[in-house]
Amino acid sequence: MIESYSDSFVAMKKFAETYAKRTNTFFCNDLSITQIVLEGLAKHKDEYGAPLCPCRHYDDKSEEVASTYWNCPCVPMRERKECHCMLFLTKDNEFAGSSQTL
């Protein structure tokens, strides 16, 4: 991964690594997907103050941030280990890599 990123990107990367280890999930075997998702989370963190899931469409992003449902880690991820963005994958997922670090 490229090393010159914003503070928010670095924070999201650290969060993702910690969360993957804690939940025993793995990053996608195509790390370009992981990078794009982290960039989207960092952008939303900068713009809205929270890491809103970048892989969904929202009519009102500020309203979604306030509801917290789709803030990463989203409710489906926390409850069922279902990550729509493919950032956190269970080891039985065909797209899961073997890494929990970036």
Curated annotation (Swiss-Prot):
Q: Cite the binding residues for [4Fe-4S] cluster.
A: 53, 72, 74, 83
Q: Which cysteines are joined by disulfide bonds?
A: 55-85
What is the required cofactor set for this protein?
[4Fe-4S] cluster
- Presence of keyword Iron: yes
- Compartment(s): Plastid, Chloroplast
- Note accompanying the cofactor annotation: Binds 1 [4Fe-4S] cluster.
The primary site where this protein sits is plastid
State the GO CC annotations. chloroplast
Give me the segments passing through the membrane.
none
EC annotation from Swiss-Prot or TrEMBL: 1.8.7.2
What family does the entry list?
A: Belongs to the ferredoxin thioredoxin reductase beta subunit family.
Which Pfam family, just one, is annotated for this protein? FeThRed_B
Record's protein name? Ferredoxin-thioredoxin reductase, catalytic chain
Keyword Ion transport part of the UniProt annotation: no
Q: What class of enzyme is it?
A: oxidoreductase
**Alphabetized SUPFAM superfamilies for the sequence:** Ferredoxin thioredoxin reductase (FTR), catalytic beta chain
Q: What does this protein do?
A: Catalytic subunit of the ferredoxin-thioredoxin reductase (FTR), which catalyzes the two-electron reduction of thioredoxins by the electrons provided by reduced ferredoxin.
